[in-house]
């Protein structure tokens, strides 16, 4: 009998000791559980037949936290885990790990990679990895072991060593607990695993190859795989979606620095969410700015202005720095009837439960921003410039940040204005398909086609675009469902070009999973409903930019606006705290009808 439970499971150990004796092994059988062994509900787990007795099934939105595990698995150790993968196309999935990225705590991870193979990751002031050459079998139990000494790490699959790497220094200790099925970080499940886990052990020393080989006994238990729900079409299935290295480079694009990378002279530690708008011959850009950590009260909304089409930028101006525990962050612009409006995401204190949207209008004489107060509450964060609909109202795409328990999903949403009154909006939260689970972070964008509105949104940690459709000017929506278009785990930005082509800026390739590189733009044929070609805007290492060029670059939260035959695309290098601009000739995106 199956027993579904909501959980960030905190499972107590059978035996935990901090001495280096062989008898002092931390063991989590994961056969069953009792209510008093839980804490911090998140996601859903279910009892299933395990490799050894019972096991726990995770739904792709759950994570298991091992109680009292923070002191374990440092320097010399061995971690072993039975796992049964259900979906090998879900991007990078954590089987086990000891990391909290937002706190700078990184030690090690065991993952299933986008290619469906096992890999170990070890922190050495940067990740070093041990890839496994063997494919995994969905529905079957596998046993993985990571054996680590002070100067070497070895990865095993089903009792056999599959790779190793030298370590320049021992794996350092952090306060992060060990988690299974994902990483629990800043209130979110990251790199979630879909499948089942069983029998996790942590030895306080590096086990020998002979011990590990002797400890493996194959499991004949197999699981029936969940029947996949047919994806909704967003990509033209008659066309092959290329791998990143096979994408055509968009022609004629130029690149400019909007905000220089860290360390800059402004003390910035974090920036995100470029917004763009042309207004009276000038190009305005906004972004979130923080000398501290993301989503904290020290967040500010900054603005810069270019008078030469984005080639150079004036000094940054503070639109709103907030007061007390108020943080004001990134948002969107709208130039309307001679006025420049801004709608910015904001929050009090700890972000969740207080998210709202504030409106501002530019005073043309003083070049200062006049605050107009809160115009949307209940968790609305703006993600796309408002667009006028044929019924006379404006529609603004966004994210609904849940104010309930932390296991609540954060679905895509839109706001609809009261005609031309841009201070009065109604939020319409988009329902989500039941099979998506709760691990959703629905940063969304819309394409307006008369009364028909398409909403494309980020899934969460799964690298796949969600799609929802309204046939009544955004008043009601089909449930947001998984589409047939891979997309990285970042905010997308979409629209319709003057050529009649739909476009989508994000990272859309067949092989990059949740990586935010390269930066791409997908387009349709003129008047067509499906995307059918993807261009590369730029790659991580790129000689054509005056800005960041590095082996690992994360192109985050793009934004786009068309003007005089050019598409202006803003984006953030989140890990480098830099904002940049690509200017693309619209004619270079044209494909034959």
Regions found by a protein language model. Give the residues of each.
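Extracellular glycan-associated modules
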Residues: 23-227
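Bacterial N-terminal signal peptides
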Residues: 7-17
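Positively charged n-region of N-terminal signal peptides that target proteins for export
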Residues: 1-6
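Sec/Tat signal peptide C-region and signal peptidase I cleavage site
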Residues: 18-22
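Hydrophobic core residues within well-ordered beta-strands of beta-rich domains
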Residues: 24, 77, 142, 196, ...
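Beta-rich carbohydrate-recognition and catalytic domains
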Residues: 217, 221-269, 278-326, 335-489, ...
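Structural signal for glycine-centered tight turns and loop->strand junctions in beta-sheet-rich domains
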Residues: 34, 62, 114-118, 151-152, ...
